[in-house]
A protein has these predicted regions:
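Mature catalytic core of soluble alpha/beta enzymes
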Residues: 2-350
């Protein structure tokens, strides 16, 4: 009997230990991530200080949000809502989902705000250059001249009541590459908040949104990319919480021809890449859709006009890095910006 009692005790102990291990595994909080490739980029979403069971439920839904937006706003998918709008340019209005209507409406707002430096009707130009793809090339001057009249956000007609989009001219083509990721990041952040997630990192191909605190319960330290082509290290970092950080730089995608670099940020007014003294512009904002639209357009405005424009927009800050290694930051970042590379130096705005 004593022997049987010992065996029973050992079995009971093992059951309790197993239950404890399983319980710790199920209820222990940690960081769980998911990676995918949509919107022409690598996306990674990390949920912090969360139970695995909850992460397993939420991450597939996050993946679906990104996939749905990709299917609505992709230029490459013939059946996307964006492709349908473009195919019907000059023909008829197209009824669209709330998501793409809201993105286009916001795009037109930023086109007006920046006097056309940001223009989603830039599609004929981006298709001509195709920078970032295998068949990228430098178009002839006549080719650019022929498509420039089609690049005009003022020819986008929105009917809010009917939820329709109409492009007035045949050959017009919208390209949402400069704003779709920002919209997507905001939608993911909203979904996570509504489902009880307090801390997370959303990284959509460099469009970063940080929610709450990091795994040490502190503000996130987000690195600012060094624009130098031979560098993989950040040149600075900023400490932020519940913010979007979006950078547009000439180092991201470019075409090199006959020793000349042509970066991917095209001026909708000239048809050629923006030409100024900036290497990159980083926008820090509450909403990622704002940062996405502003990063390119503020770059296009150049240092002086861009800096003044940012100062006039409430709740938005920026980091400007010039080609001569000067760094300008707006007032809202002065207490949480750290320079890491002595090649660069902070300059005071006049």
């Amino acid at each position: 009997m004593k022997k049987n009692g010992k065996i029973l005790f050992l079995i009971t102990t093992l059951i309790l230990l197993t239950a404890l291990i399983v319980s710790n595994t199920v209820f222990k909080k940690g960081t769980y991530s998911q990676t995918n490739y949509y919107l022409d980029t690598v996306n990674e979403v990390s949920l912090i200080n969360i139970r695995k069971k909850q992460a397993d439920k939420l991450l597939p839904e996050v993946d679906k949000i990104i996939l749905d937006i990709n299917n609505e706003m992709s230029l490459q998918l013939p059946g996307s809502e964006l492709s349908k709008i473009n195919k019907n340019a000059g023909i008829k209005a197209v009824k669209v989902s709330d998501d793409i209507f809201n993105v286009i409406e916001k795009s037109v707002y930023y086109s007006k705000l920046t006097n056309g430096e940001f223009d989603i009707a830039v599609g004929p130009l981006t298709s001509l250059w195709n920078i970032g793809n295998k068949n990228a090339r430098v178009p002839s001057e006549s080719e650019i001249k022929n498509v420039l009249p089609l690049v005009n956000y003022k020819n986008i007609v929105l009917n809010k009541a009917e939820r329709t989009v109409y492009l007035k001219e045949k050959g017009m083509k919208l390209d949402l590459g400069g704003i779709a990721k920002g919209f997507c990041a905001d939608k993911i952040a909203s979904y996570l908040k509504n489902n009880g997630v307090k801390d997370a990192i959303i990284n959509l191909g460099g469009n970063i949104y940080v929610l709450g605190k990091n795994d040490r319960n502190k503000d996130f330290s987000v690195g600012i990319q060094d624009p130098a082509k031979d560098s993989s290290s950040p040149m600075a970092n900023i400490k932020v919480s519940n913010k979007s950080i979006v950078t547009s730089g000439i180092y991201e995608r470019y075409l090199e021809k006959d020793g000349k670099i042509y970066h991917h940020m095209l001026n909708p007014k000239t048809g050629y890449p923006f030409d100024n003294n900036l290497n990159s512009v980083t926008i820090v904002s509450d909403k990622s859709i704002d940062g996405d639209a502003l990063s390119t357009s503020i770059y296009g405005l150049g240092l002086k006009e861009g800096f003044e424009k940012i100062k006039s927009i409430k709740g938005v800050d920026a980091i400007f890095i010039t080609k001569d290694s000067k760094v300008y930051i707006t007032d809202g970042l002065k207490n949480n910006f750290e320079l890491l590379n002595n090649k660069y130096h902070l300059a005071n705005w006049p």
